[in-house]
């Protein structure tokens, strides 16, 4: 599924793929289809899982492939730490295979992949907040741990997503920080 173009895939195909690959009966909240050809080739799908209770396993699984051949789960050097809660599949034929993990940590190419994934996650969240704030609010309790941890771990991610972090106001309604501060600025 990840090798297809995103507009060739249906929601039902994404959900079925998620159930089969991750053996999870709960539907994911939403997903991001990665499809990049330049400056490196990267395809994949990242799912935001639904976390129902504090007892749910919040450990994700990111399966790394090279030319559709499975390589490993949860390569921390490729996936930013705060996104290790996600579930997904990433296929990167350009990734060097015959290197140690310590070499991967210092590889500029691997860092670019990690930054690209972080940017795509931030773009998806910002886009959702701007175009479908109701859905964003509905998902907030499940996605806020990802976002808050990401803000602590990644300064660029924090700078990008900062205005889209939600807080409850005194009326128990979700507001972004700029929305909460707007009445104060008017005074």
Locations of the language-model features?
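Conserved GHKL (Bergerat-fold) ATPase module
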Residues: 1-187
């Amino acid at each position: 599924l990840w090798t297809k173009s995103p507009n060739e895939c249906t929601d039902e195909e994404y959900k079925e793929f998620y159930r089969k690959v991750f053996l999870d009966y709960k539907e994911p909240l939403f997903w991001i289809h990665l499809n990049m050809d330049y400056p490196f080739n990267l395809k994949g799908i990242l799912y935001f899982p639904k976390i129902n209770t504090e007892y749910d396993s919040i450990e994700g699984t990111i399966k790394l492939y090279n030319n559709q051949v499975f390589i490993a789960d949860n390569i921390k050097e490729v996936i930013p730490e705060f996104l290790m809660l996600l579930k997904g599949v990433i296929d990167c034929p350009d990734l060097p295979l015959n290197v140690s993990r310590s070499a991967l940590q210092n590889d500029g190419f691997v860092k670019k992949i990690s930054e690209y994934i972080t940017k795509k996650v931030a773009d998806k969240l910002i886009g959702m907040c701007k175009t479908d704030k109701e859905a964003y609010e509905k998902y907030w309790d499940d996605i806020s741990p990802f976002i808050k941890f990401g803000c602590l771990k990644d300064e660029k991610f924090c700078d990008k997503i900062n205005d889209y972090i939600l807080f409850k106001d005194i009326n128990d309604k979700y507001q972004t920080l700029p929305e909460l501060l707007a009445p104060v600025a008017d005074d």
